[in-house]
Design a protein with these regions (language model features):
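Conserved S-adenosyl-L-methionine
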Residues: 150-155, 239-243
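Glycine-rich adenosine-cofactor-binding loop
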Residues: 17, 111-114, 121, 125-153, ...
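Rossmann-like adenosine-cofactor binding region
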Residues: 176-244
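Short, conserved loop/helix-junction motifs that constitute active-site signature segments
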Residues: 6-7, 128, 150-152, 211-219
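Phosphate/diphosphate ligand-binding glycine-rich loop within oxidoreductases
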Residues: 2-125
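Adenosine-phosphate binding glycine-rich loop
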Residues: 224-287
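NAD(P)-binding Rossmann-fold cofactor-contacting core
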Residues: 153-176
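Helix N-cap at the beta1-alpha1 junction of Rossmann-like dinucleotide-binding domains, i.e.
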Residues: 20, 163-164, 228
């Protein structure tokens, strides 16, 4: 590539994961780049952990960055040249920024899930959060724990389905300098006392809680899922008078920060959200 054409005219980005065909990320990013007047493309690439090193090496210089789903958020870390302090603390990078070209290229890992969660909660709880419950102990739970630390939450209870599988979350808590209380599923007593309940568990995992311990008036329920949506717990919580945030809002907020990292420009969040809502409505009509 000659010096006169060192920067490709059309830039590219992609989301990696398996399965990935369901992802709404391409819809959100396409909306953002259209509003910003950029000739950028954003695609979904099927990729599992074993394929990740090969896919990473195959990307040409038109790529500005990547979005990653679990478990790739953790698997990518040893393949990067630089990792932000936040991504190191959380133990996951959902975003890769490509800095430089050719022999000067460096791949930098960032975590935009954490500021995405912070933004989503702050919009609904501008006066702050006293205490919170996280359902689940996986990678997204670690991001939620970091977000709650940034929000100044002193007491966080993590409800886990298997204490033996919560080791990585405990290590994350140590890196963050926080001491959450881990309790066994379903943690109904903790649910009833929380200002905010964040669910990071798979679809269907909270269905039984929907009939027994939904969020109530004065509480905020935040589910990271957007497909399927709404979940039974979200429906029951709304009926009980709770405020509810769906996973689309997290997807929009974390994607907006990816756009800003890659372009250096403010992301058009409203247009991204509208595109995501339209895509979800279309899926609902066709299902």
């Amino acid at each position: 590539m000659s010096p006169l054409s060192a920067v490709p005219a059309v830039r590219r980005a992609a989301v990696l994961g398996s399965p990935i065909a369901h992802s709404l990320s391409p819809v959100l990013h396409a909306a953002a780049y259209q509003v910003l007047g950029l000739r950028w493309s954003y695609s979904a690439i099927e990729c599992d952990e074993a394929q990740l090193p090969g896919v990473l090496m195959s990307l040409d210089e038109s790529f500005v960055g990547l979005s990653l789903t679990m478990p790739l958020k953790r698997a990518i870390l040893p393949l990067l040249d630089d990792v932000s302090e936040l991504a190191v603390a959380v133990g996951a990078a959902n975003t890769v920024v490509f800095d430089g070209l050719g022999p000067f290229l460096r791949r930098r890992g960032e975590n935009t899930d954490v500021p995405g969660i912070v933004a989503a909660i702050t919009a609904r709880r501008p006066d702050g959060v006293r205490n919170a419950v996280i359902l689940g102990a996986g990678g997204t739970a670690a991001a939620a724990l970091a977000a709650l630390r940034e929000l100044g939450v002193d007491g966080t209870v993590v409800v886990v389905r298997d204490q033996a599988r919560a080791g990585e979350l405990r290590r994350c808590a140590d890196r963050l300098g926080v001491t959450p209380t881990l309790v066994d599923w379903p943690g109904r007593a903790a649910l009833g006392e929380a200002d905010v309940i964040i669910s990071t568990v798979p679809a269907g995992a909270t269905d039984q809680l929907a009939t027994q311990s939904p969020a109530a008036h004065g509480q905020l329920f935040f589910d990271v899922l957007y497909d399927p949506w709404p979940t039974a717990f979200a429906v029951a919580s709304l009926a009980a008078g709770a405020a509810v945030i769906g996973g689309l809002e997290l997807l929009v907020q974390q994607a907006a920060r990816q756009v800003e990292l890659w372009t250096g420009r403010p992301a058009p969040i409203e247009e991204m959200r509208a595109a995501g809502e339209a895509a979800m409505a279309s899926r609902s009509e066709s299902s």
